[in-house]
Amino acid sequence: MKDMPLRIHVLLGLAITTLVQAVDKKVDCPRLCTCEIRPWFTPRSIYMEASTVDCNDLGLLTFPARLPANTQILLLQTNNIAKIEYSTDFPVNLTGLDLSQNNLSSVTNINVKKMPQLLSVYLEENKLTELPEKCLSELSNLQELYINHNLLSTISPGAFIGLHNLLRLHLNSNRLQMINSKWFDALPNLEILMIGENPIIRIKDMNFKPLINLRSLVIAGINLTEIPDNALVGLENLESISFYDNRLIKVPHVALQKVVNLKFLDLNKNPINRIRRGDFSNMLHLKELGINNMPELISIDSLAVDNLPDLRKIEATNNPRLSYIHPNAFFRLPKLESLMLNSNALSALYHGTIESLPNLKEISIHSNPIRCDCVIRWMNMNKTNIRFMEPDSLFCVDPPEFQGQNVRQVHFRDMMEICLPLIAPESFPSNLNVEAGSYVSFHCRATAEPQPEIYWITPSGQKLLPNTLTDKFYVHSEGTLDINGVTPKEGGLYTCIATNLVGADLKSVMIKVDGSFPQDNNGSLNIKIRDIQANSVLVSWKASSKILKSSVKWTAFVKTENSHAAQSARIPSDVKVYNLTHLNPSTEYKICIDIPTIYQKNRKKCVNVTTKGLHPDQKEYEKNNTTTLMACLGGLLGIIGVICLISCLSPEMNCDGGHSYVRNYLQKPTFALGELYPPLINLWEAGKEKSTSLKVKATVIGLPTNMS
């Protein structure tokens, strides 16, 4: 009982002390501000609960005169503070200071000598124009400095002296026009540098060499057109780099090869037109690759992504012109799990592309104009366990009979095993005006089974095969045509032709040089009959092909009193010989060639020719053949009739089913009519590019009355 008064006095003393501290705390907290304990993450991402004074968005004109002594985080964002005066009352434990969105115009107006424990300083969206020498040297413990979205145009070489513990530096969205490697001499421990969205003219070799511990570099939105080969030398610990939203026209593969520990690469939103062979190769630690939102990207070529043993994900989405991925584009990627190819212009994806990725688990190819034919049959043949992402958004665009259907619902047996080449319409423009002396490239790619061969035809009719190199032209093995030093003589129509054993496709581009075509020379057109047989005529022609459109059309008309038959084909302008077949013996034909020009004029010429008559031995041979053929057909029909009769008599079979079978059998020819004629005939009868044609017409003038 004697201890009871003592206990009461102790408890009363504690209560009074707590009350006094609470009153002091309330008195110390600046007017209108909020003072409380809040969660906070240090620059090292360590969680802590910090004493926070929140004075954001209060319209303050000056720095608070008095703060609680235990303040660790001070938030002064969105005020009108223009200067921080020296004070002896700065909290000694202040580690975070946010002065974003104020009126600070000079770092010299920020007196921070009494804040040695600061770890993070935010000066975003102020009016700072320069960083003079040693301007923040008192902040020896500073780890984060945000000066983005200011008006910085000048940074002195020694501006960051004293900040040897700095880990993160944000300088993006200022007015810097160059990067000085001397800035970084005082920052040996810097891990993250963001310097994008500045009007930097160029990056120089060794620009970042002092940053030996840098792990992340963001150089986004500064209109870079190239990266020097040695620009990234010295960044041995760099793991992530972003060149987002620049003007790179090709992958800076030489510079990237020198970042040996790179894991994440962002090249999104650059006008790169091709991912070429070796662009991403032998990058042993790369895990993720981003090539999204590239407005000019057309193709990913053979072995473009090769020997990346740790790569897990490729994102190549929202590229409006990406229409071709080579079957061997992705090679030696043993750990690739995710392939994102949605929202491009892909009509197909080769099975070989998928087969080369042994660990692939998911693929996204929806929102592409898929052509449901031979190339994508594999998707529905149950030959893969890969998960298709958003399969309900995967639709056929061609052919017409499958248009609008879900790709995964079209049975693979309904798709042909081989198919015509298709050159993507996005490959290159139909018309282009260039300046004399300029350099241009046209990227022609086509999908088909079997894989097509690609070549080009010049306005002069010259045929340029892959790997052809001349003074003016170079055709890459993938189908790209380079024209060097364009002159008015190189103006005219250039045609890319993709062909395989099924047929061909072509796409042309009309080039004007300084807004005009080559001068019209009113060239002539000559026709020559080179060979005449009973059932064929070999015709050749010679024209001033400089002014020809680079496609031709041949039409043969056969007239009798009661019949009219026509055959047609269109072939490249480099072909000046054509064999008219399936003609009648001893028949006079009128063969006409009609050539439209780039000046919308026509060259037309006709010749008359009579096919040879049949030799008596040939007549007898044909007669015997006809008799034999009729006998075979009669026998075949007899066998079919017996089968039908047996089918009708059988109680287990339906007679109507037999009739249906015969009817279907007779309606389906056992061979394609296209096999009787050159492959281009059926292709061009559909009327594609009818305006760019050369017509060869053969019309019957006299038909013999006695063929025996």
Swiss-Prot record:
Alphabetical UniProt keywords: Disulfide bond, Glycoprotein, Immunoglobulin domain, Leucine-rich repeat, Membrane, Repeat, Signal, Transmembrane, Transmembrane helix
Stretches in topological domain Cytoplasmic: 650-708
GO CC annotation terms, alphabetical: extracellular matrix; extracellular space; membrane
LRRCT domain span: 368-421
Any one GO BP annotation for this protein: positive regulation of synapse assembly
Annotated organism of origin: Homo sapiens
LRRNT domain span: 23-69
Domain Ig-like C2-type, first and last residues per copy: 421-514
Record-annotated membrane-spanning stretches: 629-649
Domain called Fibronectin type-III: residue spans: 523-617
Gene: LRRN3
InterPro entries: Cys-rich_flank_reg_C (IPR000483), FN3_dom (IPR003961), FN3_sf (IPR036116), Ig-like_dom (IPR007110), Ig-like_dom_sf (IPR036179), Ig-like_fold (IPR013783), Ig_I-set (IPR013098), Ig_sub (IPR003599)
Localization per record: Membrane
Protein name as annotated: Leucine-rich repeat neuronal protein 3
First and last residue of the signal peptide: 1-22
Cystine bridges: C444-C496
Membrane topology field: Single-pass type I membrane protein
Extracellular side of membrane: 23-628
LRR repeat feature ranges: 70-91, 93-114, 117-138, 141-162, 165-186, 189-210, 213-234, 237-258, 261-282, 285-304, 310-332, 335-358
Glycosylated residues in this chain: N93, N103, N223, N382, N522, N579, N608, N624, N625
PROSITE patterns according to UniProt: FN3, IG_LIKE, LRR
